[in-house]
C-alpha cells in the first residue's frame, strides 16, 4: 500500500472518531452502557466487569471485558468507537503488571481479585475536586 493510500485511510479514520473515550487499561473495572435494540424499542444495558485485554489500532481499537454472571465467566469484546456504546464509566483502577489478563479465566472467587491502584484513584479524585472547585 502506498503512502498516499495510507494517509487517506488515516485521515478517514480520524474523521470517524467523534467521541472521546476515557483512558482505561487492563485491570480496571468499568461499566459499559450498551444500546440494545429490542423490536422497535431501544434501551441501555449496563455491562460491568474487568478489562482483561485492549487492542489499540485507531478506529479498529477494541477491548475485552470479563464479568462473572450467575457463577459463569462471561467475556464480551467491544469496539471502542462503536455507535452501540453509549458511555464508558471507570469504577475502579486496577494494579496489574501483565498486558493481557487471560490468566483470570482459570481463577475464581477471591483468587481472581485484582489489587486496586490507590495512587491513580487518589489522583482522579483530586482532579475532580479541582474541576468542581473551579466551576463553583
UniProtKB/Swiss-Prot annotation:
<protein>
    <recommendedName>
        <fullName>Large ribosomal subunit protein bL19</fullName>
    </recommendedName>
</protein>
<dbReference type="InterPro" id="IPR008991">
    <property type="entry name" value="Translation_prot_SH3-like_sf"/>
</dbReference>
<dbReference type="GO" id="GO:0003735">
    <property type="term" value="F:structural constituent of ribosome"/>
</dbReference>
<dbReference type="Pfam" id="PF01245">
    <property type="entry name" value="Ribosomal_L19"/>
</dbReference>
<keyword id="KW-0689">Ribosomal protein</keyword>
<dbReference type="InterPro" id="IPR038657">
    <property type="entry name" value="Ribosomal_bL19_sf"/>
</dbReference>
<comment type="similarity">
    <text>Belongs to the bacterial ribosomal protein bL19 family.</text>
</comment>
<dbReference type="InterPro" id="IPR018257">
    <property type="entry name" value="Ribosomal_bL19_CS"/>
</dbReference>
<comment type="function">
    <text>This protein is located at the 30S-50S ribosomal subunit interface and may play a role in the structure and function of the aminoacyl-tRNA binding site.</text>
</comment>
<dbReference type="InterPro" id="IPR001857">
    <property type="entry name" value="Ribosomal_bL19"/>
</dbReference>
<dbReference type="GO" id="GO:0022625">
    <property type="term" value="C:cytosolic large ribosomal subunit"/>
</dbReference>
<dbReference type="GO" id="GO:0006412">
    <property type="term" value="P:translation"/>
</dbReference>
<keyword id="KW-0687">Ribonucleoprotein</keyword>
Amino acid at each position: 500500500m502506498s503512502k498516499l493510500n495510507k494517509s487517506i485511510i488515516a485521515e478517514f479514520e480520524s474523521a470517524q472518531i467523534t467521541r472521546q473515550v476515557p483512558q482505561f487499561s487492563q485491570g480496571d473495572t468499568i461499566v459499559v452502557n450498551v444500546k440494545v435494540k429490542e423490536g422497535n424499542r431501544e434501551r441501555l444495558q449496563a455491562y460491568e466487569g474487568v478489562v482483561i485485554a485492549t487492542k489499540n489500532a485507531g478506529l479498529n481499537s477494541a477491548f475485552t471485558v470479563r464479568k462473572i454472571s450467575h457463577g459463569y465467566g462471561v467475556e464480551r469484546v467491544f469496539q471502542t468507537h462503536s455507535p452501540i456504546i453509549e458511555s464508558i464509566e471507570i469504577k475502579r483502577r486496577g494494579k496489574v503488571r501483565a498486558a493481557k489478563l487471560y490468566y483470570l479465566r482459570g481463577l475464581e472467587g477471591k483468587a481472581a481479585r485484582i489489587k486496586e491502584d490507590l495512587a491513580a484513584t487518589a489522583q482522579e479524585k483530586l482532579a475532580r475536586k479541582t474541576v468542581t472547585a473551579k466551576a463553583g
